[in-house]
Amino acid sequence: MHLSADISSALQQIEAVKKGIDESDDPKLQMQTAESLSTILGILQDPVFRTIVHVQDSLSELNAQLAQHPSMLPNDFDIDVAGNLVLSLNGGEVMYDFDEQRSSSHSHSAPGSPDKSGGVGEEPRPQSQNSKGAGVADLYATDYAQIQAIELVNDGTGLGFGIIGARNSGVIVKTILPGGVADKDGRLRSGDHILQIGDVNLHEMVSEQVAAVLRQSGTHVRLVVARPVEQSVPTPQYALEPGTAVVPTRVLVDPAELERYLISTGYPEIFGESSTASTPQTTTEDDRFVYRGETSMLIDPNIDLEELLALPETEKLQVELKKDANGLGITIAGYVCEKEELSGIFVKSVSPGSAADLSGRIRVNDRIIEVDGQSLQGYSNHQAVELLKKSGQVVNLRLERYLRGPKFEQLQQAIAANDKLPSSAPGTPSRAPMPTPVATTSSATTTPSRSITRELEEEALPAPEAFMTTPPSVTTMTTTTLSSFGAGKQLVAVRDSLDGSTKIIPTEVVPLADKTEAKNSGVITRHKYYTDPELSDDAETEIIRKWQKIVGSDVEVIVAQIKKFAVGGLGISLEGTVDVEGGREVRPHHYIRSILPDGPVGVNGVLRSGDELLEVNGERLLGMNHLEVVAILKELPLDVRMVCGRNRNSSLLPFSDDTLKKLSNNFENLLPATDRLVKAKSDGSLATAGSVADGDSVAAAAASFSKLKSRSLEPLTGLAMWSSQPQIIELVKGDRGLGFSILDYQDPLDPNDTLIVIRSLVPGGVAQLDGRLIPGDRLLFVNSINLENASLDQAVQALKGASKGVVRIGVAKPLPMTDNSLKACSNASTTSEETLDAQPSPPALPTVAPPAMPPSASMGAEPDLIPDWRN
């Protein structure tokens, strides 16, 4: 029972109690209860309170609808100013949920007159078996009604009309949306009584049942409506539209009697065969997506209506497949709906005779939810392919199958629309004409409606034998055929950027060179960073000439054509640097810090540590953000063309552990510690202090490094282990902070933990003037806050949260590392940094050499983000 009905019942009970007390002879009781009863009655009768209760009832009804139809979206419902629940069904039909209690309260209204709640007023009548049906006849003020069958085709925007429903009066068309499907068709009118949808008669249906019927109606919706005839007795000259008939109003009470009357008068097609559709039906779609006239919207009349309401829209199933020589034998595609409610990885086709086909449990349009217990939520198509590729011989798939409802319709229309896109059949030989590249920028040209899903990203996976000859081939709108997920098979990814827009990214197609690939598709889709596998002399000369103009004659331009291994990256670690102007980081540069000898770059042998990355596969890296550079390097295809700059000045030694160790040993004692271990942030040239040491070697070293721009030189130490004895340093914190910056560092003894390390000192700052704190010190605590294994954010908050005045800082001093310890800690990786003061940077203090850095992480598989050691 609705809350409003409960309140009405309570109101009646309280009024009865009040009446009984008023009629009693107990003045004391009357005096004690009069005020309370009046207050309660005033609240229960208050119009605002009743409206709130009505809204609450609408929300309860909405919850019930959501439980039955989980695919409902925010745009599918609303609550009007009267508090009524408004449901937008099937993309556009609107149903106003009618409250019978409100209907009875307006029973004094004239028949057919709309009340303020949007319902239809009715006169009180004796309850009988046919009382509900009699209400239908009472809607008409004439003795005759016109019956018409109308078929509308939902174009994806809805049918464009609104309805109101009451239990006794049936379903009435309330509004016609201008420009909608019904408005363009012109046959449906406001005030029409809807008698039937498809083969389902709406006699005595409640709103929930009508909602279920509308949700099952599909794309082609056939309505049988009745409207009053203005003339009391129709004459032969009465103009009837095609597919219409005039019947006595009394026969509308009984659907069976109405049908018999129509048959006897020569109009059997109104309740039988479909009328002419208002929109031409297309027949070019794949058979499984063809809407078969009215049969696509019919519901088995033998199904109980209560059972119909409980039918689920989806079902989930678990399937175990064993790979054969051809893999799984399914093709997948990624879809994203505009409403963002229908998205994921779907089965697009099943290869005959494959493991998936023989299982008999996988169907086209099934959505893959999990692979071996791993959820695919948020996975791109490429990531899903990778996961399936890495699965074992036996694969457990969890699938979701759409059986009915809006998502089912949207998925059918989406795949049908995609099937219309130009593509090359699998059997097309390589000499077939090339299709025009797809470059669609609006949903109107890619899908038949605004709510249709779009295929945003697909991947290509060749058949096993394709690896022995030419590059894999796929269709223009490439799909992922999971038929070669065998051991040792290589996945060549066709990765286009996936954004949230409505466009399909244009692809470039090239012909196959070998007719033996005819059983695959006739075209391939190039990788977005594709480059020619061979470097011609002319191409190399042109690249060098272009970059020589940019970097100048002091830099040698090196071009390397590299072939990546089937698994892994380039085998380099990367270092990013910037210049600092006015406290802002400008002019980013990217250097090769180290090269794995047996990696692709190391085997190629052209590039060296210290070379600056300028371009890769035609993509300019100079001036690009460091994170973007790392992302590009990780996405490169097998063929890589790297353009680097190498300083012709021989005094600039390449970055290597041996070189940095020698530099550290040679120059470590040239300057006092307070001058050596300072981060320089100046834009000027670096100069050495002439008063520190004499000799030709010092002068030569100073001259060689005086030409370097400031790169925020870092501590001259390669330390990665610290003393077990903490040292307490007290610094006086002022308005400009403590004068040092920190970074988090992977614990060499436990890769899961991080350490906080002093990164650099601000020249002239508190820490630098004190002289006891040096870069490389491990931060243990600040005042009473333990930071031994704290995160960077926690350390920053502890330092910034320290009050002005004396701050007690506990540090562990670094210990010198042996060669063995260096190797043991080669996996340590610096990840991020924070500067803990806003003090303007003064001119750089004298310093002489590039830093010796802690060894970077992963010297092989992928480029690493090494923080700005030479800033």
UniProtKB/Swiss-Prot annotation:
GO terms for biological process: adherens junction maintenance; adherens junction organization; apical protein localization; cell-cell junction assembly; establishment of planar polarity; establishment or maintenance of apical/basal cell polarity; establishment or maintenance of polarity of embryonic epithelium; establishment or maintenance of polarity of follicular epithelium. GO terms for molecular function: myosin II light chain binding; myosin phosphatase regulator activity; protein kinase C binding. Residues 840-854 have a biased composition (Pro residues). Residues 437-451 have a biased composition (Low complexity). Keywords: Developmental protein, Membrane, Phosphoprotein, Repeat. Residues 3-67 form the L27 domain. Residues 100-134, 420-453, 822-871 are annotated as: Disordered. Expressed in primary and some secondary epithelial cells such as ectodermal cells, salivary glands, foregut, hindgut and invaginating tracheal cells. Also expressed in specific cells of the peripheral nervous system. Expressed in the germline. It is found in: Membrane. One of its GO terms (cellular component) is apical cortex. Residues 149-229, 318-403, 559-648, 728-814 form the PDZ domain. Residues 822-833 have a biased composition (Polar residues). Belongs to the Patj family. Involved in cell polarity establishment. Probably participates in the assembly, positioning and maintenance of adherens junctions via its interaction with the SAC complex. Component of the SAC complex, a complex composed of crb, Patj and sdt. Interacts directly with nrx via its third and fourth PDZ domains. Interacts directly with par-6, possibly mediating a link between the SAC complex and the par-6 complex, which is composed of par-6, baz and aPKC. This is Patj homolog. It comes from Drosophila melanogaster. The gene is Patj.
